[in-house]
From Swiss-Prot:
Compartments, record wording: Nucleus speckle; Cytoplasm
Protein name: Polyadenylate-binding protein 1
Compositionally biased spans, kind Acidic residues: 16-30
Compositional bias of kind Basic and acidic residues: 1-12
Organism placement in taxonomy: Eukaryota, Viridiplantae, Streptophyta, Embryophyta, Tracheophyta
Protein source organism: Arabidopsis thaliana
Length: 227
């Protein structure tokens, strides 16, 4: 009998947790309002998380656009500064450019290793040198000629004396700088000039219709002779 009581006690004690767990699940289920309450809770969580992600994405896109705008401004400023440094005569009128060209000379056959300071020293005796420009290609390599701008107009004639003088062991070519007029080409004088009309045209030689073979005979027409 004592054994039987213990067995019944053990069986009864093992069923208690199952009932308590079921009661707790039921209470939690009722507190959330059943299936509708659980679904409503999920719907309240999902829109909140997605809206936060959307706000973060918009904020990041705005930051990227601001960075791109700042980069474009820096690039435009750098290109503007570079263009101004490469073209010192930018924004100058045609009259001012012509006046500057009247005080400038062209120097050809310049050694590639020659520096602007050496060119300035070479023409220092002709007058006050204002600027020396050695032209380069897109790779930064010298093209072999330069322009020298003086302060005085008379220095141009004085510099022509140094034509075919030696600089870095090479004979340089010195000439006055010409002003390039847009849309016009200067005639270089090479070849024969164009003649719009010719005063004399030779006659066309006559060739017989039968150049080869037997020449046909042409008979006189027969006249009527009654006697």
């Amino acid at each position: 009998m004592p054994v039987h009581d213990e067995q019944e006690h053990e069986v009864y004690g093992g069923e208690i947790p199952e009932e308590e767990e079921g009661e707790m699940d039921t209470e939690e289920y009722e507190e959330h309002g059943g299936e509708e309450g659980a679904a409503a809770g999920d719907e309240e969580l999902e829109p909140g998380s997605s809206s936060r992600d959307l706000e973060d994405m918009k904020k990041r896109i705005k930051e990227i656009e601001e960075e791109a705008g700042a980069l474009r401004e820096m690039q435009a400023k750098a290109e503007k500064d570079m263009g101004a440094s490469q073209d010192p005569s930018g924004g100058v009128s045609a009259a001012e450019k012509e006046e500057v060209d009247s005080r400038s000379i062209y120097v050809g056959n310049v050694d590639y290793a020659c520096t602007p300071e050496e060119v300035q020293q070479h023409f220092q005796s002709c007058g006050t040198v204002n600027r020396v420009t050695i032209l380069t290609d897109k790779f930064g390599q010298p093209k072999g000629f330069a322009y020298v701008e003086f302060v005085e107009v008379e220095a141009v004639q004085n510099s022509l004396i140094l034509n075919e003088s030696e600089l870095h062991g090479r004979q340089i070519k010195v000439s006055a700088k010409r002003t390039n007029v847009p849309g016009m080409r200067q005639f270089r004088g090479r070849g024969r000039p164009f003649r719009p009309m010719r005063g004399f045209m030779p006659g066309v030689p006559f060739y017989p219709p039968y150049a080869y073979g037997r020449v046909p005979r042409f008979r006189r027409p027969m006249r009527y002779r009654p006697y």
